[in-house]
């Protein structure tokens, strides 16, 4: 093979990922067959799980679907699991795939309504503590019924829009014309301090909103993908799920909202910055122009989206159908009554969800390997050997630590499957099984706010267009999430241990 061709192949492998990352993935692929031959399938299975967790932790270097997919293709070739076992896992978890395919796309068509709500709140409330609380509450409420990724996307859209308007004004450009938002070279010296303060203001609001999605997402069956997965295993419907997790989720929700207000009052961990008055004047004038230019068709679209949201909440509460099918109904209702009939416009609604849906299939392949090699059986047996009152707390901690560095859907899938198998084997009562299921659900949802790796909404925020504009880095996100991690994670553990 010629050198130019070899170089092109090496350059194309995993795209723009760092060279060291490409080398590590290649080493994994070479090492696994050697491990299988020398030390057996169980140790190789553990190596595969750790390698996959590595790809999740390094999600900012390369989306985990590609390296994780390569590892799992190799696992299938090495017969560490079978295509039939993977297919059975997918069949078993089909409701979760439906959720990601149709519910996320359905909420995409409500973006105008959600953007309208967040914009009104941002400009209508002057108290920063109340504003932060409203962002957190609204994000929590919406995430309890909708999709956390979509709610985060809407908040990001509002933030990008407002940032762009002021950045253009500060640069002497027309606020309605495109300009380079990444560069501050054209920003007048007079406006630089206000722009930096506005960045800090947006950072704090976005973090409050992202945490809100976790606070609300843990409460209901559809709040997070892993909730539906756990609810499906337990046979819980929407109301059942809410009532089962309420002893943990509701106290944590209250504590999280109190933390939100306190952080704004004490101005620690990067919170408490106010919106500069010159920025408020510019944005208010811009919003007034937008309102005046809104057409009758746009107003009708907002009403249609609002009615569809009400129907969605009612259908979820009554469990009239699988969650994903309700999402498909929302797509049909909104598009039919707002005139969205173009195939390409419909297709854009599915773009956000399909990469993660594909990654979920890889998750289930890892779970199939874990099942076939019985990797987690010793750990589950150790937990179940503890006194019954200690088991929920230990499962919560085990889930929380792993979810902080890995993906919480992956972690929840592993633990709920293993615990259910122990229940089916007669190792526990149904009541205790339900307690452990709540511990797994809250353990994957609450402590995972510690890093962007654990919560999909956090990772989405970190990799979005707004993050570099407002100087929101990985380290800064971890620092700003720290007080929430301590409060939510700590109280969640206490509630699981003593209140269930």
Swiss-Prot record:
PANTHER family found in the cross-reference section: NA(+)_H(+) ANTIPORTER NHAB, TRANSPORTER ARSB-RELATED
Top-level division of the source organism's lineage: Bacteria
UniProt source species = Pseudomonas putida (strain ATCC 47054 / DSM 6125 / CFBP 8728 / NCIMB 11950 / KT2440)
Protein name as annotated? Na(+)/H(+) antiporter NhaB
Per the record, the similarity remark reads:
Belongs to the NhaB Na(+)/H(+) (TC 2.A.34) antiporter family.
Which locations, inside or outside the cell, does it occupy? Answer: Cell inner membrane
InterPro entries, per this entry? Na+/H+_antiporter_NhaB
Keywords from the UniProt entry: Antiport, Cell inner membrane, Cell membrane, Ion transport, Membrane, Sodium, Sodium transport, Transmembrane, Transmembrane helix, Transport
Which parts of the chain are coiled coil?
A: none
Q: What is the annotated role of this protein in its UniProt record?
A: Na(+)/H(+) antiporter that extrudes sodium in exchange for external protons.
Query: What catalytic reaction does the record list?
Result: 2 Na(+)(in) + 3 H(+)(out) = 2 Na(+)(out) + 3 H(+)(in)
Q: What gene does this protein come from?
A: nhaB
GO MF terms, alphabetically ordered: sodium:proton antiporter activity
HAMAP family per the record? NhaB (MF_01599)
Tell me the leader sequence span: none
Does the keyword Transmembrane belong to this entry?
Answer: yes
| Cellular component terms (Gene Ontology) | plasma membrane
Query: Keyword S-adenosyl-L-methionine, does the record have it?
Result: no
Transmembrane parts of this sequence = 23-43, 53-73, 96-116, 129-149, 150-170, 205-225, 238-258, 311-331, 350-370, 450-470, 477-497
The upper taxonomy is: Bacteria, Pseudomonadati, Pseudomonadota, Gammaproteobacteria, Pseudomonadales
């Amino acid at each position: 093979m010629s050198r130019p061709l070899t170089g092109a192949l090496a350059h194309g492998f995993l795209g723009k990922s760092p060279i060291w990352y490409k080398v590590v993935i290649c080493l994994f692929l070479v090492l696994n067959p050697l491990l299988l031959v020398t030390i057996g399938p169980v140790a190789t299975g553990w190596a595969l799980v750790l390698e996959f967790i590595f790809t999740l932790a390094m999600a900012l270097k390369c989306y985990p679907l590609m390296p994780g997919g390569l590892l799992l293709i190799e696992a299938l070739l090495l017969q560490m699991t079978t295509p039939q076992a993977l297919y059975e896992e997918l069949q078993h978890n089909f409701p979760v795939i439906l959720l990601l395919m149709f519910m996320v796309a359905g909420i995409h068509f409500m973006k105008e309504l959600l953007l309208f709500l967040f914009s009104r709140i941002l400009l209508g409330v002057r108290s920063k503590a109340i504003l932060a609380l409203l962002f957190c509450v609204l994000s929590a409420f919406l995430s309890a019924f909708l999709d956390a990724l979509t709610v985060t996307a809407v908040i990001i859209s509002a933030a990008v829009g407002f940032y762009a308007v002021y950045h253009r004004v500060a640069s002497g450009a027309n606020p309605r014309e495109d300009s380079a938002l990444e560069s501050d070279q054209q920003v007048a010296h007079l406006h630089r301090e206000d722009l930096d303060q506005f960045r800090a203001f947006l950072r704090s609001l976005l973090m409050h909103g992202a945490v809100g999605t976790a606070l609300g997402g843990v409460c209901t069956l559809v709040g997070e993908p892993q909730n539906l997965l756990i609810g499906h295993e337990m046979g819980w419907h929407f109301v059942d799920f809410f009532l089962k997790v309420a002893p943990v989720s509701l106290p944590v929700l209250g504590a999280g909202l109190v933390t939100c207000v306190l952080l704004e009052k004490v101005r620690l961990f990067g919170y408490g910055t106010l919106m500069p008055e010159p920025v408020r004047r510019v944005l208010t004038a811009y919003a007034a122009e937008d309102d005046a230019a809104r057409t009758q068709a746009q107003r009708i679209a907002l009403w249609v989206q609002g009615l569809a949201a009400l129907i969605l909440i009612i259908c979820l509460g009554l469990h009239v159908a699988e969650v994903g099918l309700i999402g498909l109904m929302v797509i049909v209702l909104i598009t039919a009554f707002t005139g969205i009939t173009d195939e390409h416009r419909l297709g854009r609604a599915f773009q956000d969800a399909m990469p993660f849906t594909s990654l979920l299939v890889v998750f289930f392949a890892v779970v199939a390997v874990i099942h076939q090699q019985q990797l987690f059986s010793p750990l589950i047996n150790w937990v179940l050997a503890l006194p019954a009152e200690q088991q929920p707390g230990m499962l919560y901690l085990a889930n929380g630590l792993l979810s902080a560095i890995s993906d919480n859907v992956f972690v929840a899938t592993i633990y709920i499957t293993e615990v259910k198998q122990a229940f089916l084997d007669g190792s526990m009562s149904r009541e205790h099984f339900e307690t452990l299921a709540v511990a797994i659900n809250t353990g994957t949802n609450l402590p995972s706010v510690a890093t962007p790796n654990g919560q999909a909404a956090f990772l989405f925020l970190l990799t979005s267009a707004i993050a570099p504009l407002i100087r929101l880095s990985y380290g800064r996100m971890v620092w700003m999430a720290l007080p929430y991690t301590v409060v939510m994670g700590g109280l969640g553990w206490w509630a699981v241990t003593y209140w269930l």
